[in-house]
């Protein structure tokens, strides 16, 4: 049973690692140029602070997820890992929220502010941003499941002990 728990945890951490890595790479490589009559323009992730934040958070989560893969199952650091999982789950949530807000404005524009949508002019860029957001959502769901499972496995023996 303990081996099955370890395998399940490793599988979830591998999925979280992979999806966070994909999200960071896809967003960091999102770039497209275009022109409208004689005006040239360029869309890249680094033009938007929310997208930069998204890449940084997913890069940090990727490194953390990779390092957590090598933590021995008997280690007392797992309680600290649970706290860190909570922090990183919140960071991923905030980075996705910020990036989705900016992506929505890029896709639909904002008629009240006079902002025009840009996805018609730079569809490849918008597709890459959408792909990065999809990978990050999978990472977030995986982290939420991992967090609940970790809390259950670490705290359950403590709750069942007789005092």
Swiss-Prot record:
Family matches, as InterPro entries: CASP/CASPL, CASP_dom, CASPL
Where does the record say this protein resides? Cell membrane
Keyword Disulfide bond on entry: no
The protein's UniProt keywords, in alphabetical order, are:
Cell membrane, Membrane, Transmembrane, Transmembrane helix
Q: Name the residues that span the membrane.
A: 7-27, 53-73, 80-100, 131-151
Does the UniProt entry include the keyword 4Fe-4S? no
What's one GO-annotated cellular component? plasma membrane
One of the Pfam families matching this protein, by short name: CASP_dom
Q: How does it sit in the membrane?
A: Multi-pass membrane protein
- According to the UniProt topology, which residue ranges lie Cytoplasmic? 1-6, 74-79, 152-163
* Segments on the Extracellular side according to the record's topology features: 28-52, 101-130
Quick one: signal sequence residues?
none
Name the family: Belongs to the Casparian strip membrane proteins (CASP) family.
Subunit and interaction comment: Homodimer and heterodimers.
The record, for NCBIfam families, names: A_tha_TIGR01569 (TIGR01569)
What is the official name of this protein in its record? CASP-like protein 1C1
Originating organism: Ricinus communis
């Amino acid at each position: 049973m303990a081996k099955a728990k370890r395998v399940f945890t490793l599988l979830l951490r591998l999925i979280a690692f992979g999806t966070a890595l994909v999200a960071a790479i896809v967003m960091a490589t999102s770039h497209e140029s275009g022109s409208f009559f004689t005006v040239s323009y360029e869309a890249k992730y680094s033009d938007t602070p929310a997208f930069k934040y998204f890449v940084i958070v997913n890069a940090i989560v990727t490194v953390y997820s990779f390092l957590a893969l090598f933590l021995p199952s008997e280690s007392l650091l797992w309680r600290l890992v649970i706290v860190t999982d909570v922090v990183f789950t919140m960071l991923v949530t905030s980075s996705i929220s910020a990036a989705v807000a900016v992506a929505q404005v890029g896709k639909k524009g904002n008629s009240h502010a006079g902002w025009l949508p840009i996805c018609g002019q730079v569809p490849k860029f918008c597709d890459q941003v959408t792909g990065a957001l999809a990978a990050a959502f999978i990472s977030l769901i995986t982290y939420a499941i991992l967090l609940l499972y970790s809390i259950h496995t670490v705290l359950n023996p403590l709750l069942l002990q007789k005092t």
